[in-house]
């Protein structure tokens, strides 16, 4: 009788263990998909590169491509996607402040130097007085573009404006440039219609623009605008996110960036 009870008890324990394992397995299966929003290049290209590595960890990486700088942050905050990969910290922080969001960076990966391009002029000195210069209209990238122009002594900004400078903060403009504030994604399309445009690397690349070859003025490689993987606060320790961080900062990714972008259009920072 004691043996029967013992066997019954062991069977119950075994069944409980199997049941628990099944529950864990289901939970793991439910959480195995990781959805990350990204702009096409280089972000989506990098994510697609590491998808097989995450698959080995039991994680299916789903890459959702966006062509603007607003929707991917809305999607992370609302929980529609798990993370995004397209922005730098100053932009993320300004977005949090403006919308009351709770976005945080989990890892920095690379810098995409900003550059001034022109279809009409071949040298910076050729840009005439009164020229129209298109710049990004989002808070941090607009300030970043103006700081780039200031670095070449084309304009002077009020030092109090900092990274969020706008054309209203220009205190000296000897050549009387006219600034056209345009959504960053649209800048390559309007390049032919203006005298010059300051374009973010992730939009310049798909448009066939090479910063080193085509840029009249290029941001230094020591730029503080490192691109990051962003999640909603509280999700930093999600095992899927940790696996993504490990994969996206691997030697494989570093070599991919150096090989695919040998002209410094994208510079790894890890």
Cite the ranges covered by each PLM segment.
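A bilobed periplasmic-binding-protein/Venus flytrap-type ligand-binding module shared by bacterial periplasmic
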Residues: 113-124, 226-238
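A conserved helix-loop-strand patch within extracytoplasmic ligand-binding domains
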Residues: 106-155, 254
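Short helix-initiation/N-cap motifs at beta->coil->alpha
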Residues: 63-74, 161-189
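Short, low-complexity disordered leader/linker segments with a strong preference
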Residues: 1-33, 269
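Ligand-binding "clamshell"
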Residues: 94-106, 120-121, 193, 198, ...
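Short, well-ordered beta-strand elements
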Residues: 30-41, 59-65, 132-133
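Periplasmic-binding protein-like
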Residues: 141-150, 248-268
């Amino acid at each position: 009788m004691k043996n029967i009870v013992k066997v019954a008890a062991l069977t119950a324990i075994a069944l409980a263990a199997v049941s628990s394992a099944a529950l864990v397995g289901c939970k793991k299966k439910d959480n195995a998909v990781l959805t990350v929003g990204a702009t096409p290049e280089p972000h989506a290209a990098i994510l697609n590169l590491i998808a097989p590595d995450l698959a080995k960890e039991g994680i299916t990486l789903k890459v959702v491509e966006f062509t603007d700088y607003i929707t991917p942050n809305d999607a992370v905050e609302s929980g529609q996607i798990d993370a995004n990969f397209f922005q730098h910290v100053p932009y993320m922080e300004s977005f949090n402040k403006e919308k009351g969001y709770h976005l945080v960076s989990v890892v920095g990966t690379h810098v995409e130097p900003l550059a001034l391009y022109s279809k009409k002029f071949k040298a910076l000195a050729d840009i005439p007085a009164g020229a129209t210069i298109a710049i990004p209209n989002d808070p941090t990238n607009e300030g970043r573009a103006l700081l780039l122009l200031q670095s070449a002594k084309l304009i002077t900004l009020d030092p109090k404006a900092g990274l969020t400078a706008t054309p209203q903060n220009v205190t000296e403009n000897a050549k009387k440039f006219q600034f056209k504030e345009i959504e960053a994604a649209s800048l390559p399309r309007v390049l032919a219609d203006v005298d010059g445009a300051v374009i973010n690397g992730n939009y310049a690349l798909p448009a066939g623009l090479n910063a080193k070859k085509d840029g009249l003025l290029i941001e230094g490689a020591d730029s503080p605008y490192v691109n990051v993987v962003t999640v909603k606060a509280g999700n930093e320790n999600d095992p899927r996110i940790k696996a993504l961080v490990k994969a996206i900062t691997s030697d494989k990714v570093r070599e991919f960036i150096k090989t695919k972008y040998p002209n410094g259009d994208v510079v790894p920072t890890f």
